[in-house]
A protein has these predicted regions:
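N-terminal transmembrane-helix/juxtamembrane module of multi-pass inner/ER membrane proteins
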Residues: 1-80, 120-134
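Hydrophobic, aromatic-rich alpha-helical transmembrane segments
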Residues: 12-21, 67, 97, 101, ...
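Alpha-helical transmembrane segments of multipass membrane proteins
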Residues: 26, 30-31, 111-115, 180, ...
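C-terminal ends of transmembrane alpha-helices
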Residues: 33-36, 116-126, 179-190
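Alpha-helical membrane-inserting segments
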Residues: 34, 65, 114, 118, ...
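Membrane-interface loops
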Residues: 48, 84-85, 92-168, 173
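Alpha-helical transmembrane segments of multi-pass membrane proteins, especially transporters
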Residues: 51, 55, 103-108, 176, ...
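Membrane-embedded catalytic cores of phosphoryl/pyrophosphoryl-handling enzymes
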Residues: 131-247
Length: 247
């Protein structure tokens, strides 16, 4: 039995190694980061450097940086992000495939809903070290702007990866997400840990959806179901004959 289980594991690693790497790097690690940050915020109120980073950015404020931060934070507001996500989802449904439309819509829309839920649970108060140029209300953890921008960038990156123009998403997208996150800290409405949690949570959420919508995930699930059926024939039913793997 041990030899058979070990052989099944080796076969899974060989056949599905890219998907398993995506599960580890794109899904597990971001959630580990998010859970760690959330735990520190919950138990200790945040990281020791949160306040120092805010004060350093405010000490180096400048009119040009003020305008840049306001522009970036406006671009990451829920309304324009929601409109953009809705238009992109509709476009994918018309000109691409329904799974891609579902993937993109759930990536951005789901990230926004998750953000509201986490804010209500953690209930972290916003920093109030100076009067902000654009005050924000409700709770602070995690940054919805950072999470929405990261979800948009990550989803576009996955969708465009098979195409030649993928670098048009993989370079500006992360820069946009970084810029939006910086603007929230610069304006004094979020702690750096809020932004870090928003980024990590989005990458983990979108990566999870990418895996679930991947044909390789269904192949991997079928592979392990067949293996379990061979070991536990009376407990696990085999895949149906001719069962179609979703695209």
């Amino acid at each position: 039995m041990r030899a058979s289980c070990w052989q099944n594991l080796r076969n899974a690693l060989r056949i599905h190694k890219m998907l398993l790497l995506a599960l580890l790097a794109g899904l597990v690690l971001p959630w580990v980061v998010f859970v760690h940050v959330a735990e520190v915020v919950w138990e200790a109120g945040g990281f020791a450097g949160d306040r120092q980073i805010l004060e350093w950015l405010h000490a180096h404020a400048a009119p040009a940086l003020d305008q840049l931060a306001l522009a970036l934070t406006a671009a990451g507001d829920p309304l324009p992000m929601g409109i953009l996500a809705a238009l992109a989802t509709a476009g994918l449904a018309v000109w691409s495939t329904r799974p891609q439309a579902w993937f993109f819509g759930l990536s951005v829309g789901g990230a926004m809903l998750l953000n509201v839920a986490v804010k209500a649970v953690v209930a972290r108060l916003r920093p109030a070290l100076w009067p902000s140029l654009k005050p924000a209300f409700y709770y602070s953890f995690r940054s919805g702007h950072a999470m929405g921008a990261a979800a948009l960038a990550t989803a576009l990156g996955f969708l465009l990866w098979p195409h030649r123009g993928r670098w048009l998403a993989w370079v500006p997208g992360p820069l946009f997400a970084l810029g939006v996150g910086w603007s929230r800290v610069y304006l004094g409405v979020h702690y750096p840990s809020d932004v870090l949690a928003g980024w990590a949570g989005s990458v983990g959420w979108v990566a999870a959806l990418h895996v679930l919508f991947s044909p390789g995930f269904h192949e991997l699930r079928r592979f392990w179901r067949e293996a379990l059926h061979r070991r536990l024939p009376g407990v696990v039913s085999p895949p149906r004959e001719g069962q179609r793997v979703p695209a």
